[in-house]
Amino acid sequence: MVKLAEYPRTATFAWSPDKVPVLATGTASGTVDADFSSTATLEFWEVGSAESGPQGSVTADAKFNDLDWSRDGAMLAGALENGVVEFFCARERRSVARVARHTTGVRAVRFNAKQANVAVSGGSQGEIFVWDTNKISAAGYSPFGPGTAMTPIDEVQSLAWNQSLAHVFASAGSSGFASIWDLKAKKEVIHLSYTSPHSGLKNQLAVVEWHPSNSTRVATATGNDNEPVILVWDLRNANMPLQVMSQGHSKGILSLDWCKHDEKLMLSSGRDNTCILWNPEEAQKLTQYPTRGNWCFKTKFAPEAPDLFASASFDNKIQVQTLQNLANKLDLDETAFKQQESEADFWNNVSQSESKEKPVVTKIQAPAWHSKKSPAAHWAFGGKIVRITSDGLGVSVSKPHIEGFEKNVMLDEALQSKNFVPIINKRLAQTVTPTNEEDWSLLESLSMDGKDTYLQEALSFDDNEAVDSQPDTKDEDFFLNLTGQYEPSGEFELDAANPGITLNLLKGELSKAVNLALEKDLLLESLVIALNSDDDQIKQKVKNAYYTKYASNSQLARSLYAISERKIEDLVDNLNVSQWKHIVMAIKTYATEQSKNSLLIRLGDRLLQAGQRQNAVTLYLAGQSLDKVASVWLRELPALESEMRSHKNTLNEAHLEALTEFVERFTVLSAYINEDGGAKLTNEELVSKFLEFVSMASSSGDFELALKFLENLPGDNEQVKTEKQRVLIASGKCATTSATSTRRGKYGSTTVAPGVPGMPAAPMPVVGMQPPANPLADRTASYGAPGYNVAAPMPPPNGRPNPYAAPAPAYQMANPAAHGKYVNSASASPGHNTPRGSVSMPHNPYAPSTNGAGAVSHNSYAPQHVQPAGQPQNMYGVPPQRNFMNQTQDKPPVNPAATNVLSGQSPHLNRKANNGWNDLPEIVKEKKSRAKPVSTAPVAVASMTGMQASPNVTGGTIPPPPITRVTSNTSIAGSPMTPQKLSRKSSVVQTTALNAPVPVNPYAPPVTGRNAVQSPPLNPYAPSGAHAAAPPTGTYSPHLAGQAIDHTHRATPLSNMAAPPQKAMPGPPPKSMARKSTTSEKDIDSANQLLSSIQKAPNGGPPPRKQVVAPQPSVHAASPVAEPVAIPPQQQLIIEFFKEELARVTPLVPPEYNKQLKDCSKRLNILFTHIEKQDLLSAPTIEKLHTIVALLREHKYSDALAVHVDIATNHVQEAGNWLTGVKRLIGLAEATSS
């Protein structure tokens, strides 16, 4: 290959400093185009695309003598023949400044190698000027000179900056010598001249070039034809050259270029029409390239692709070649083939064939960048690049910043906190297409309203849609029917026209009467007869006759057929898609539960084919089909990636951004749609996309995020197995991962996770009665999960800790109960069978299950053989499934997300986050309770945990005490851990001496009136005493009677033997048949003071007085009731303006946009609430809202939208759902402004 590219231009040129370089060419001075045009043009060419012409062009002020590109790639400078130095913006490809400082034509211009904004230019009469491109646009700007010269200088033809010192440069020209200038000294500091040893005459040093790394070494070349030589100087001995290269050019040299990547390579070109490659260190000629048709006045290496070089000649060609342009076997074969062609073929093609002359190679020398490769392998993974040094003795590890490979911190935090609002706001501010914006708006609605509310609004009829809704007039019709019924009167005769029908009616043979009526087309009469018949076949026959006659022509009859026969599929498949909401209504009303989802999906497919893409997605969501939504998004992914290419520098960046956006979108959707269910990815294309994202996350070093997604991919997929093993090894978690690790599911089910293939099993020690690190993640369901009060083996001494276990909590927290959704606070204390000296260790998610041999898995609150009345059961009969991205939350995160992160809107997923240990529900609903009959006294069971902890107590158990006729309202022994503060945070309780119960003695006599111990305050959320037979199951339920534990001796082991039953103490009858509500504000404000310990003496004694026990002191003081905050007047202006603007646009908005208007109003109210409470928005955000208000007043809607984007980008934690309301108000205001 002779050349890579050839551009038909007589022009000087400059390379861009890019890995894939661009060549800029400027029309050369003193030349005439083929069309005799005098226009000077700066053109940009991409290497390899010469056939398609230049990629851009700029008209210059005059033709070019020289052209140079700044090292940062931002600016080009042209030395023009009219004395002007013109500067061009490379990115925008336009002229930015023209400064005429030279008195005659500018001969040379060069940018500084260290400071990209500094340049130097030279011309005739010794004019040299230094430029600062940061100031060239200022009015009256003028460059400055370098200082005083040693001797007078004539024309400056060549300039070069020192590659190490930014203040030193060299010049050469027609004066016969070269000068070294120091801008700090402001003068010429060194004078170079050369006298030929052959002629004794001084040679003209016309060209100068600096060494790429040595600041004291410079090369010069002579421009005369008598003795063309290249001289290499060491400035420490400026009297004589270090090297002389003379056996090369036959005429004067016009250009030099010293390779920046290899100091042993130098290019030269001259008046002998040739380019030569030299080794200046050894003064040896390496390669002489083919002769050109005219002078080669410039040659240069590409700065970042040194394998390429370009040469410009006056033969109207700029050639781009490679250093590896050497003769090979293909060239020899082509030459042999040409020698065999006929004379006629030769003469026919001779005018069109190009010269295939090859370079003459004197010595083959590999460039330095080919010989510096490490003898060992290089590899990159986890965001790091590992290199073995060239000497093989060291290792270099670096973490480069690559666009698109940054850690996705926002997604990682969202998965931990379940708050996806920041991601939604970010994507809404950076939407790519209108369809993409609709998807993220859908997700925002889901985050704010929840799935059910969103679907209800999306599937409901708009205000402008015709839906006739008649008021219910059943009662009025009843009275009308009473007075308006038909009452026969007068004589009449039987119908003589239809005697058969009449006769069969009189005989009661209704079937025959119907047949005769249908034969005579008496359809109405047939319907009346069928209504009086109990035979369904007769009714069906008449209906079929009606449908046959009218259904093909009557739309009402067709609808009656579909509804009457329950053929909803006919509506789904055949009704016009414009009436799809009516079809949805029919599906919801008449379809079976098993078929609803499939029918919604079928209707969604029809809408998608009809082009109603967003409505189809809504129906897929209603039909619980994430796979369908994923297929739609996957089909649109290539188009989205293509759209992103215009905003990214490379195709790879666009691909990674499109992939990340898709994964975020699907993850957010799955989190909101599968809030109560589980989802495993099964779609192969979807799995492949998530695997690609996992690989990208691993490449950036985000192994935790990669593992979260891998948990939700099918485990039987070989690629998933391989990727998971690779991530585990890279993250350092594989060394202690067992082959089969047991972990407790979200609802208490024990699941066995497959380990990494080939890794040894390392069972972890099991520590009894230790709480999980995350109590919300390890709740136990009510369908038979193992109990926690189980005898556990002692941990081995000096056991090796689990490096991946979460850190132990700062306080002792209760274990979940085996039954019930809420955890009884009694389990806060250790089990009675806990051995003394048990080491408190964090919950180990990899520990084997405790329900093996010898383990007890029954309820820790009731004997196994007793089924208490009112025992809460799982209403669905199956364990609740985990949702798509929450399966990995079973294991406590290594770095839990902060709980006090601000957010503009509480995420919908947190609605049920209060089901955790000792947490109050977010919304306390008053439950209706029926009147309770007088019940028997509760069974006082002492030390229940001790009973069930022993595996020997299975068959024979101590019976309960006899039932008495006296009902008791006596308080059962309360839990030693009572709620101290109504908070969503887990309670941290400290027990005081005031209400500390005494240690339990299973052999002590029954408690009497004298030695009865005062119980701590009962929990207000415990069931009333009337539910005597039901064991406590709620979080705040008290212990059973007599089960009091000394908090000061938690580790004291107690006997495994159960205590004898104690007689229940009777009490007065219940005060009320209805359960007292506990949801009033007064109750909530003083939750710890609602109940008191009430005990009664044995039978026969007087009833004891009620003793009110002071509430326990809490670690966290109760929060005072928030008082109204005064809104600053400046912020009140924001509320007033938005309300006024919303009121202005409301009557102007078309009816079809009423939903958007309502949504805008709802979101703005969220903003108003935050301003009124002063609880979210920071001062910068408030200031930007003021800016939006000011811009809207001036009708600058695009500027206001830009401020909105700024808030969404830089204030993510504050930009909640209200921000979309501001955006929509801006759009509505702009649309209605004219």
UniProtKB/Swiss-Prot annotation:
Biased composition (Polar residues): 824-837, 847-862, 1086-1096
Main location: membrane
An example Gene Ontology molecular-function term: structural molecule activity
Alphabetized UniProt keyword annotations: Cytoplasmic vesicle, Endoplasmic reticulum, ER-Golgi transport, Membrane, Protein transport, Repeat, Transport, WD repeat
GO terms under biological process: COPII-coated vesicle cargo loading; endoplasmic reticulum organization; positive regulation of ER to Golgi vesicle-mediated transport; positive regulation of protein exit from endoplasmic reticulum; protein transport
Membrane topology listed for this record: Peripheral membrane protein
Cellular localization per UniProt: Cytoplasmic vesicle, COPII-coated vesicle membrane; Endoplasmic reticulum membrane
Membrane-spanning segments: none
Name listed for the protein in its UniProt record: Protein transport protein SEC31
Function statement: Component of the coat protein complex II (COPII) which promotes the formation of transport vesicles from the endoplasmic reticulum (ER). The coat has two main functions, the physical deformation of the endoplasmic reticulum membrane into vesicles and the selection of cargo molecules.
GO CC term (a single one): COPII vesicle coat
WD repeat positions: 5-46, 59-98, 101-141, 151-191, 200-243, 248-288, 291-331, 378-398
Subunit structure, as described in the record: The COPII coat is composed of at least 5 proteins: the SEC23/24 complex, the SEC13/31 complex, and the protein SAR1. SEC13 and SEC31 make a 2:2 tetramer that forms the edge element of the COPII outer coat. The tetramer self-assembles in multiple copies to form the complete polyhedral cage. Interacts (via WD 8) with SEC13.
Chain residue ranges for the region called Disordered: 822-870, 1053-1115
Family of the protein in this entry: Belongs to the WD repeat SEC31 family.
